[in-house]
Amino acid sequence: MASLAAHLDRVKNNEKINPIYDEENKTFKADGETILAADDVSGICTVLDALRRITASDKPHGDIEVAFSVCEEAGVLGSKYFDFNAFKARKAYVFDAPGHIGRIILQAPSKCKFTYKIHGKSAHAGNEPEKGINAIKAASALIMQLPDNRQSPYTTTNISTIHAGTNSTNVVCDYAEILAEARSTNDKEFEEVLQKFAAPIKEIEEKYGVTIEYNENVMYYTFKIEPEEEVVQIALKAMNKLGIEPVLNAGGGGMDGNHFNRHGIKAIGIAPGYFKNHTPNEHIFIEDLITCGKLAAEIAWSVK
């Protein structure tokens, strides 16, 4: 028994999607102004095509579960709230990854999002600046103490956003907000980096007289599937039968597979053939997409 999964949502698309058929390269591509949405409409097409092939055939197959999530692009939020007790399958195949058909994702990181809301005190910058508490200055000092960039082969961090101030230069800024993230495929390093993001807060509050509202939100946890595990071997045998060359990779972002694995369902990611997702240059190779439907069906026929 297996679950076939994909997500229904896509990133912001400027209110339109205009697919273009590129006959020379045998692809569907975006129009250069917005996304194609192959991430992850191609995953949905793959699953539906697999079901079509299975129902049209008299080949025996095990039970099949289909899981279409929402809010994946917003931080893998939708599948976080699946009722995993309702799933009977202990294997899941998530058709959501960039790359040619044959790419299998065996690992993805944990991710935590951090928010700092820094409260200072406003004052007139010309008449009585000494009565103000500058939130920007405190935020800058805080940022300099936060981990940033690659921390190790397993862990990355990023200070992504700061909001502060107004267009008026005569006001001491009383509020600033910082957004940051951390990712890691190592559980110990993930816990350590979470502590590093929290560590400077008290010192900054005391030194600059601000108050800081701090929130850390672990969005999903890492997983790693070994190549010899059954969930992988089934996919590899199906690929071999279809003449697909497998490529086993780790992914740098989260996916619905993170939550499946967290709840004891062995899950891997499979690429349906799209590239440059989330950009106006997104495209998908049509032959890869068709083959991926065949692959999903072959996997379903192989899982008893």
PLM feature segments, named:
Residues S168, D174-A176, I244-V303:
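Zn-dependent metallopeptidase/amidohydrolase metal-coordination segment
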